[in-house]
Amino acid sequence: MHFLKEIIDILNEDLGWELHDVVAEGAYGQYELDFGYTDILQMADRFVFLRVLLKEIAKKHGYFVTFMPKTNISDWRSGAHINHSVASIKTGNSNIYKDGENFSDKAYNAVAGILKHGAAITALALSLIHI
């Protein structure tokens, strides 16, 4: 599919985002794109930019992109999920566990931040209207 090939080339070759996986989701035309790690602010910027980029490239190829969890009553539903990773920016190592078993303070802080900002994350990433 020329649309996906162009997106993959732009993200990896032009932008250097380290796209490492494109997975077909449950319904026709649904895909999950998985990127290399970066800090949270840069990933948020990439997320917003990616939505605009996908819509523009799709339009160029005669397609329409939506991020709605479900586009109509009879269609397969979207997973409408966001994957999170907690890792050191300096080393890239996971810092979720402090001793291999118990959560670290950083892991608790990450979860607290997600819970505190859950409404905003949902509004931006899992919108019910087409944006």
Task: Cite the ranges covered by each PLM segment.
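Glycine-rich, acidic/polar active-site loops that bind/position phosphate-bearing ligands
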Residues: 1-128
